[in-house]
Amino acid sequence: MNPNPPVFVVDDEEPVRVSLSKLLRAMGYPTQSFASATAFLESEAVSEHGCLLLDLRMPGMSGIDLIEELTRRQLAVPIIVMTGHTDMKSVQRLESFPLVGFLEKPFSVDQLRELLDRWRFGT
């Protein structure tokens, strides 16, 4: 039995999903990845206790749209947002949500580990 709760990777880019999933497993986290926000919402993972590693810009439902939908459904999912395209409008929209943290792509393993530790241990 794995002592770490799962991390759910939601990103429309397959290479990102694959590499993050491998990295997270190497760090001891069970993972499940999703190619879209809609796929995550339609899965059983949405009701599991875990952390969401979420890309902001995706076709269809964006990462911000997913955060808003989870909030509307009153699902308190810990979320680490990642993006390669930071814009002030998105940052301002995100300020109203209790996120674990924000990663700007490309990010380091240490940056990811720091946010996972913050989620797990409150550090």
Language model features with spans:
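Two-component/phosphorelay signaling modules centered on CheY-like receiver
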Residues: 14-32, 97, 119
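Acidic catalytic/metal-coordinating carboxylates
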Residues: 35-36, 62-65
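Short amphipathic alpha-helix used as the core "switch/output" element in two-component signaling
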Residues: 42, 64-75
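Active-site beta3 strand of CheY-like receiver
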Residues: 47-53
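Receiver (REC) domain active-site loop signature in two-component systems and cognate sites
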Residues: 58
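Alpha4 helix (beta4-alpha4-beta5 surface) of REC/receiver domains from two-component response regulators
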Residues: 65, 86-102, 114
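C-terminal output helix
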Residues: 89, 107-119
